[in-house]
Amino acid sequence: MSALVVGASLGCDSRETATASESPPPRTAGELSAYAGSESCAECHREAYDEWKRSHHANAQRDLDPALDDEVFSPRREIAHGSQTSFADTKDGRYVLTTAGRDGKMRDFVPAEALGVFPLWQYIIPGERGASQLTELAWDPVAKEWFNVYGNEDRQPGEWGHWTGRGMNWNSMCAPCHTTAFRKNYDPVADRYDSKYVEKGVGCESCHGPLKAHVEWQRKHPDGGFFGDPTLKKLTPDQYLAVCASCHSRRGDLTGRFAVGDEYFDHYDPAMPDLSQTFYPDGQILDEDFEFNVFQLSYMHDAGVRCNTCHQPHTSKIRKPVNDLCLDCHQSSMGGRIAIDPATHGCRPHGPDAAQCTDCHYPQTPYMQRHWRHDHGMTIPDPQLTKEFGIPNACNRCHQDKSVDWAIESAEKMYGERMDRPTRRRARVLARLKQHDFTAVGEALELLAAEKNGAWRSVFLRMLTPAVYEPRDPDLRQAVRQVMIDRLGDPSPLVQSAAIDALEPLGPAVSDHIRPLLHAPYRLARVKAAWALRHEIDLQSPVGRELSDLLVYSLDQPTGAFRWANFLNETGKPGQALSWYKKAVEWDPHSAPFRHGYAVALSRLGRLDEALAQMLEGVRLAPQDGLFAHSLGLVYGEMGRLPEAREALARAVALVPDQSRWWYNLGLAENQLGNFDAAVAALEKAEELEPSVADYPYALATIYLEQNRREQARAALGRVLQIDPNHAEARRLAEQP
């Protein structure tokens, strides 16, 4: 079983006959007639329109412009990147990018539009079946040079992340946030897009909603009418925040239908700090998050700060110089605020190089090689966490010539006991959990119970999830499971979602606890619950349709194909699932999990030779993943190739030594090969890891009986009956003379 992961990379199969049960119909074209276009706003809102027109939002996607693009392609430019060399040129009056295509051959590609303004822009190349691709080669308008946004990764044709692959597909990856009112309109049967949008760039109606009715009413009532304009709806600060967050967050899309005024968690599943390498344990960004994700974790978010508190909405620029902006709130301690004295606060309070608040509390990280992004978690630098866990601090980001110990000493001199703040304790606990240090679980549960921020509560649950399955400490395991069950009732959709993800692999044992969330207030929790209960869900029910919508929307990416294949496979349609697994592998051939899922499905259908080929490739792609080695051993076992099975299973337990079932399977393989001592050792290890499982001592008992070691067999059978007094086979063997 697998948790419902809603990512940016999802997928489909165009060769399978579409039926209601196996290939959901494509979404029809979105209704765009309610939009008037940004130009109409200029009639009454000229100042705001002019500010917007010059903004990055307005120019997020644009037509080609000789004033901007001539110098990019003329004179001819050679672009060296990784092992490849590409060229930008002008041919027959057209801009041309000569680079490796999908087949690996050098070809001329003619860009149709540009994406982005500063500090870089990329070009959109029209493709087949309504798809467009975004170049990995970008132009730096300041340095006036080409570069590869992936640096020296040297992505190759055929890879998901190559510019010709699904990972660089404009319709799926770029257009929703670089156009206004975008509708993807993907047909999974034909593998074709019929994408539509109102206008290029982030237009007025991206943030204000469709305004055609407003424009028409205003033209008919230039005096404003007696009761005012009935077409306008007033948004709350959180609704405005959701508008910004719909693009300024790293998230999975649940619907593809977010509209101004909607709840964020009815449409998106944001990435949050967890066991992956996306965030540091203290919440700082490691990989790109596009601002909103960590902003939810900040004190400022909880205090009511919203995007337009600091940013002018039409220019997107900050409203005033950085320090003045912060001091608007931090001049006094009214309302529980932390008062800042600019004359003494920080390490460089005076002079022309005086520190900006953002230097310490909004540290920058470069993405796409040259795009520096501020961390919006508004964290407080703590060099001590750098020394203990490698978590970066803003002090050493600036003072790169100084040691971490110097930064620790300097911070202690300036702030003293204030450095030992609750955020340090929280970061330490989460860092230990991320290292699978279960001695931190007790303190984590204590902090979780006291945590007021729902986003942080969800982080605790994500970090605690491995403890739900800790085999060596049943008391700890049960305690954490109960906390997860209790947190299903948390008011935060992030917490509900994290709890469902943690519990879902337990299957029917937790179904009754999860089932009430089919009626949760937010779609995020509802679809997670529906996925967890997919074996019983009616796809024609309201929540079933929501789950179906999610599965449909993501069918143009390999993760979507894989998820749909899992759905079919786990709901009794393994034959139908195969082509979707195959499509996931074709679209992302370097994904070991996709090959593993495909191999398991093939194996269950008895197609062992094909399963073995996929499993071997999965192990080659992820040689340090014990799960794949274990599954390879099982396939070899099914094929009767016991020496290879034993070797693969031994590799699996060497990589992940705490999986009791893997030791059990290794023990069975060793026994079949006649390796009695090795079999006993493996089974004893399985029992040591999880002494509450009757299978392990029972297997030992049968092996001891085969060797006529009756005393040891009786002892093992005694342990079986302690665990399960009704174990029929153990009782029968124990009663034998």
Segments the model singles out, each with a brief description of its role:
Residues 15-25, 29-32, 39, 47-116, ...:
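Primarily the internal scaffold of c-type cytochrome electron-transfer domains
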Residues 438-448, 470-488, 507-518, 539-549, ...:
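Amphipathic alpha-helical scaffolding segments comprising HEAT/armadillo-like alpha-solenoid repeats
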Residues 493-496, 523, 558-559, 592-593, ...:
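Helix-start (N-cap) detector for alpha-helical repeat units in TPR-like alpha-solenoids
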Residues 505, 535, 570, 604-605, ...:
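Register position in tetratricopeptide repeats
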